[in-house]
Amino acid sequence: MNRRIVLLPETLTHRIAAGEVVERPASIVKELLENALDSGATDINVELERGGCGLIRVADNGSGIFAQDVTLAFARHATSKIAEFDDLYRVRSFGFRGEALASIASISRTELVTRTADDLAGMRIVVEGGNICEKTEAGCPIGTSITVSRIFDSVPVRKKFLKAEATERAYCLDVITRLSLANPEVRIRVFSKGRELCHYPATSRLSERVALVLGNADADRLQPIEGETDRVRVTGFASRPDFTCATTRQIYTFVNRRHVRDHLLNHAVMTAYRRVIEPRRYPAVVLYVDLDPADVDVNVHPAKLEVRFRQPRTVYEAVVEALSGMLRGMGQSALSLTRYGPAGTAEIGHIPQEDYESRISEALRRYSLASGSRKMMYGTGTEANPVNKKHFLAERIRGEEIHARESLLLSPAPALPQNSFHPVFADLVYLGSLWDSYLIFSVADGMLLIDQHAAHERILFEKIKKAAERNKTAVQVLLIPEILNLSRPDFERFGDVVPLLEQVGIEAEPFGGEEIIIKALPTLLAHLDPGVLVKDLIAECADRGGGLSLQEKGEKIYAYLACRGAVKAGQKLIREEVAQLCRDLDATPFAATCPHGRPVYVLYPLKDIERMFRRR
């Protein structure tokens, strides 16, 4: 059906535009805080009710708004930050479009009280749904206080998409955390339900603000970074290779003190760390990139979270070099830290191109040694000169390996109904392993490679899931309970995660302030650091659990625990362990892939192998 083109009413266009700027209460907190910082404030108080869904109030001691400009402040595209197009390429303020207050006021009730140093009295204005309701003089201190309530009342559809109160509060605290890292010289306090949630005192030392935000325990494992070219200056703090996180949530990137989510910067960080930390783990980094405003375009994203660099290669190389310099300064050369041992989870795709020749040579050398000393018999699965297994285990098993091995050799395979899964793996002829990561088997019509980490990961996932669903998870009480200090956003998220933690055998509860106490872990993972484990699980649910059901979030946790508990790439398995792995695979459903969807095994047909040698 054809319809005429019509001009949309102004109220509707304002609400559509507001949807680009105001996604959730945290968006409002961000815009109001940025306005306060742009006004030169050195003291900012934030108040949240119902996680920001009920009320948001931001009060500052900045320069205030002139009385004659108060009404204009709520007009769309009215701003004091720029006056002409070229100013966009010189802007250093957080805001410059003149959209924030207009967008916020169009979907809420907004009250603004402000006074400048030149005015004897302040001004109070109330705007609801984009319409001015009240405007009067008011007594108030120098600065601005903005109160936003009835959020999304005029846009009920958007209101339905809001999460639980604790989740929305955590989003708000995340925004405050990032802005506090960019502005250590400003005191920021946050209140909710009459109590102080967090307090960031003003400091001239960035390291003090970083320690306060991340926690002293994490900050102690960070190293300062610094690098400079003729166009770019890079500073900040970055973690040592032995301190990693489950997600990228601990990577904070700032361009000219503006928090951004930039793929180029994230890629530069991971490039510097790619050969010193294991795959699927991430460093903790607080990164500041400073350059001429003319060399970066901040007018790319409505929320100003993305930027575009005029010379991206220059920025990329400066970040990589600054981080690499820090790592080199610690005596951690890239080659010496390449992890393919017990702590790694390396995959073929993560082996650097320049390492292929040396790895192939080493594989051939080890193969020739094995052929000469052990005389492995092709196709028999036996050794002519078997080694002393107890001596071998005593020499090889250390740290986490022993728990992964116990889960292979001692844990019974999950019981399945008869004939529900055809046992094919136990019948395969084991030939050896490639890089102590991929198990090689001879089959009737070719060669089969099994990723030992992915296979064990799938086995453990099904065991953990089954035990959790039946409330039969084996638990080990910690001899000395672990007290863990969380960041305020993570502490808010902890309450949502507690039922899932209990389900998998982790006993933890609040311990006062922003601390929690961990009393027990699942036996399967009792060897892991309790604090790192719980932090990773909170991050896992925060980053990847949005919009998922409790069951789906539970499966995210099962997959994470299985990954941490499984044998690693680079971890040598003896024949008994390989045999047990095959038997467990036969009894495990969905054995073709790991919980993350990667293949467990790959078949190389004989005809393809013969074709490579031109026999066909």
UniProtKB/Swiss-Prot annotation:
Taxonomic superkingdom: Bacteria
Cellular component GO terms held in the UniProt record: mismatch repair complex
GO molecular function: ATP binding; ATP hydrolysis activity; ATP-dependent DNA damage sensor activity; mismatched DNA binding
Gene3D superfamilies recorded: 3.30.230.10, Histidine kinase-like ATPase, C-terminal domain, MutL, C-terminal domain, dimerisation subdomain, MutL, C-terminal domain, regulatory subdomain
Keywords: DNA damage, DNA repair
One of the GO BP terms on file: mismatch repair
InterPro entries per record: DNA_mismatch_repair_CS, DNA_mismatch_repair_MutL, DNA_mismatch_S5_2-like, HATPase_C_sf, MutL/Mlh/PMS, MutL/Mlh/Pms-like, MutL_C, MutL_C_dimsub
Purpose: This protein is involved in the repair of mismatches in DNA. It is required for dam-dependent methyl-directed DNA mismatch repair. May act as a 'molecular matchmaker', a protein that promotes the formation of a stable complex between two or more DNA-binding proteins in an ATP-dependent manner without itself being part of a final effector complex.
Sequence similarity: Belongs to the DNA mismatch repair MutL/HexB family.
PANTHER family according to UniProt: DNA MISMATCH REPAIR PROTEIN MLH, PMS, MUTL, DNA MISMATCH REPAIR PROTEIN MLH1
Protein name as annotated: DNA mismatch repair protein MutL
Organism annotation: Syntrophus aciditrophicus (strain SB)
